[in-house]
Amino acid sequence: MTNNTQRPSGRQADQLRDVRITRHYTKHAEGSVLVEFGDTKVICTASIAESVPSFLRDRGQGWLTAEYGMLPRATHTRSDREAARGKQTGRTQEIQRLIGRALRSVFDLEKLGARTLHIDCDVIQADGGTRTASITGAFVAAHDAVARLLATGRIESSPITDYVAAISVGVYDGLPVLDLDYDEDSQCDTDMNVVMTGAGGFVEIQGTAEGVPFSRDEMNALLDLASDGINTLIAKQKAALEQKGE
C-alpha cells in the first residue's frame, strides 16, 4: 500500500509496530507471556484451576475467563488502581469480556474438562492497542497452559481448535492505517478493533466513527488491512510457540 499521509510514527499505512512475544515471562503461572506492540507492553498469564463456576457444575465441560487491568502509571499520567476505587470501570469490564470471548472462540471447552483457565492481562505500559495486544499475547499463554495439561496427563487432547489474534485499524488523515498507536488513536476519524481466527473467521469487529462517518469502501479497506495484519500476528504466535528450550 502506498503511504499518502505521514503517520506520527513514520510507518507505512499497512505496517505493524515492532511485535515481540516472550514466553515463560513469569515463574509461577502455567502460561505467561510478555507481548509488545511497539511501546505497548502487556503481561499475559494463564492459570489452571481444578474447578468450574457454579453454572457449569456437573456439565462435564470447562471454562475460560479473563481479567484485564492497567498499572497506575501505564499511561502518561497516573491513575488510581481500580481496587482502591472499589470498582472496575466500564472500559475494563468491556475489555476483559472481549478477551474471554476471543479465546473461547477457539476452545472446545468440553475437552478442557471440569477446570477453569484464568487469563490475566496486565498492561505495564500503554501506547494504544492494549486490548488487541492482550488477546494476541493471551492466546500464546493459554497455549502453554494447555501444553502443561497435556504433559501432565490431565487432558487427552488439546481443546484449542485454531489460533486467534487481534489488531486495531483506523482512518487517519483520510487514509486507512494498521495498528494505531496512542497518537493516531487519539486523532483518527475512525477506530476499529478486529479479532480473527487463523482460518480467517471474524470473532469480533468493534468500529466507531469519531465525528466523520466512514463509508462501506473504507470499512472494507480497514477489514482487509486487519486481515493481513492478523495473519502476520498469527505467524509471530506460531514462531514463538515453535521456539525450543524456553
UniProtKB/Swiss-Prot annotation:
EC number(s) per entry: 2.7.7.56
Pfam family name, one: RNase_PH_C
Keyword Mitochondrion: no
Catalytic function, reaction form: tRNA(n+1) + phosphate = tRNA(n) + a ribonucleoside 5'-diphosphate
GO-annotated molecular function: 3'-5'-RNA exonuclease activity; tRNA binding; tRNA nucleotidyltransferase activity
Key word Acetylation present: no
GO BP, one annotated term: rRNA catabolic process
SUPFAM superfamilies xref list: Ribonuclease PH domain 2-like, Ribosomal protein S5 domain 2-like
Residues that hold phosphate according to the record: 91, 129-131
Annotated keywords: Nucleotidyltransferase, RNA-binding, rRNA processing, Transferase, tRNA processing, tRNA-binding
Family stated for the protein in its record: Belongs to the RNase PH family.
Subunit structure: Homohexameric ring arranged as a trimer of dimers.
PANTHER family named in the record: EXOSOME COMPLEX COMPONENT, EXOSOME COMPLEX COMPONENT RRP41
Function text: Phosphorolytic 3'-5' exoribonuclease that plays an important role in tRNA 3'-end maturation. Removes nucleotide residues following the 3'-CCA terminus of tRNAs; can also add nucleotides to the ends of RNA molecules by using nucleoside diphosphates as substrates, but this may not be physiologically important. Probably plays a role in initiation of 16S rRNA degradation (leading to ribosome degradation) during starvation.
Protein name: Ribonuclease PH
Organism field: Paraburkholderia xenovorans (strain LB400)
